[in-house]
UniProtKB/Swiss-Prot annotation:
Transmembrane segments: none annotated. Belongs to the tubulin family. The keyword GTP-binding applies. GO terms for cellular component: cytoplasm; microtubule. It comes from the Eukaryota. Keywords: Cytoplasm, Cytoskeleton, GTP-binding, Magnesium, Metal-binding, Microtubule, Nucleotide-binding. SUPFAM superfamilies: Tubulin C-terminal domain-like, Tubulin nucleotide-binding domain-like. Mg(2+) binds at E69. It comes from Gossypium hirsutum. GO terms for biological process: microtubule cytoskeleton organization; mitotic cell cycle; response to brassinosteroid; seed trichome elongation. Its cofactor is Mg(2+). This is Tubulin beta-3 chain. GTP binds at Q11, E69, S138, G142, T143, G144, N204, N226.
Length: 430
């Protein structure tokens, strides 16, 4: 079957990843020890997309966990589903990357990378027909960004024809964890443009806003944010794991969403998002899902789709519904908001329908869009990068690890090329 190999790196990646496995285990009826306790054959039919069946009948995630310090790994291991992972698949160093991209990419990370690649190879050999890799990481720190992109480029060398999907958490506009985020993010984007096939762009601030405004949580925790991300991650691959009327997979998604190879950074959203108190007062209908799914407030990254235009988009519906209704709603959206879609790609919204809804919902939908407005985010990071780089602030941390200023200049111009790539997209006869 079409297996997906999951890799999580750094603190952020491991926290998102462990939440994701909680969601997927729940959907497939697998308990924290790896035993199947579900009630429907559909849960087992394609369970091997994400799981390996061990000899004793236990299901083991096809997951590789890496970090440059043991802390987060220990908390994953002691967490609710910590015992389900294969112990050999935890690969960690002791030193940490200290939020330094160069440490993750060139020094500390480079020492650990072969151990990670061995585990990846072992997992890939266990697959019948590996479809691709999904990587969870953040771009603001050191390990997820530096070592994450190093791993992506190594996997790209070894498996050039497999899909590479990333869930990348970008630095937020107002909330900054570390002062060198713009450096780390720019150096990472430089790599992702070249080596990844599809990047789902996430950002903590947008996720905070969704939790605060829509879900009415007064003090959202990272756990709440990661829950949103994992719902989306599960939605992107649900068609591979459950039978559906209209299937999509990672490659179909890429073919339908990427008109130009470099422009593969997508905005994602999920519906229905309702606060816990108001759930019972809302009917779940396809029009309602569609409306929320296309709502700008629902996007999980800090860019406003109303400031740009959609090149392409994909809507993945889950639950019992008529495909005709789903298609009609999509056509409806395009007709009503035609100025927000480029007119030189006709029918640029792809929809797919999977019969099994997420736990506790009768229907749901996941949105993935390729919008030119995502340049706002790259522009913002780029401006912060330039402000510091002009003064050569904090550079010694990177050059001390053997990096060259030239590399910063290259990354900066690659980011600017990406932004102008989005800006040059012709609008409506202007």
């Amino acid at each position: 079957m079409r297996e997906i190999l999951h890799v999580q790196g750094g603190q952020c990646g491991n926290q998102i990843g462990s939440k994701f496995w909680e969601v997927v285990c729940d959907e497939h009826g697998i308990d924290p020890t790896g035993r199947y306790i579900g009630s429907s054959d559909l849960q087992l039919e394609r369970v091997n997309v994400y799981y390996n069946e061990a000899s004793c009948g236990r299901f083991v995630p096809r997951a590789v966990l890496m970090d440059l310090e043991p802390g987060t790994m220990d908390s994953v291991r002691t967490g609710p589903y910590g015992q389900i992972f294969r112990p050999d698949n935890f690969v960690f160093g002791q030193s940490g990357a200290g939020n330094n991209w160069a440490k993750g990419h060139y020094t500390e990370g480079a020492e650990l990378i072969d151990a990670v690649l061995d585990v990846v190879r072992k997992e890939a050999e266990n697959c019948d027909c590996l479809q691709g890799f999904q990587v969870c990481h953040s771009l603001g720190g050191g390990t997820g960004s530096g070592m994450g992109t190093l791993l992506i480029s190594k996997i790209r060398e070894e498996y050039p024809d497999r899909m590479m999907l990333t869930f990348s958490v970008f630095p937020s506009p107002k909330v900054s964890d570390t002062v060198v985020e713009p450096y780390n993010a720019t150096l990472s984007v430089h790599q992702l443009v070249e080596n990844a096939d599809e990047c789902m762009v996430l950002d903590n601030e947008a996720l905070y806003d969704i939790c605060f405004r829509t879900l009415k949580l007064t003090t959202p925790s990272f756990g709440d944010l990661n829950h949103l991300i994992s719902a989306t991650m599960s939605g992107v691959t649900c068609c591979l794991r459950f039978p559906g009327q209209l299937n999509s997979d990672l490659r179909k998604l890429a073919v339908n969403l990427i008109p130009f190879p470099r422009l593969h950074f997508f905005m994602v959203g999920f519906a229905p998002l309702t606060s816990r108190g108001s759930q019972q007062y809302r009917a779940l209908t396809v029009p309602e899902l569609t409306q929320q799914m296309w709502d700008a407030k629902n996007m999980m990254c800090a860019a406003d789709p109303r400031h740009g235009r959609y090149l392409t988009a994909s809507a993945m519906f889950r639950g019992k519904m008529s495909t005709k209704e789903a298609d009609e709603q999509m056509i409806n959206v395009q007709n009503k908001n035609s100025s927000y879609f480029v007119e030189w790609i006709p029918n640029n919204v792809k929809s797919s329908v999977c019969d099994i809804p997420p736990r506790g919902l009768s229907m749901a939908s996941t949105f993935v869009g390729n919008s030119t407005s995502i340049q706002e985010m790259f522009r913002r990071v780029s401006e912060q990068f330039t402000a510091m780089f002009r003064r050569k602030a904090f550079l010694h941390w990177y050059t001390g690890e053997g990096m060259d200023e030239m590399e910063f200049t290259e990354a900066e111009s690659n980011m600017n090329d990406l932004v102008s790539g989005y800006q040059q997209i012709p609008g409506r006869y202007r």
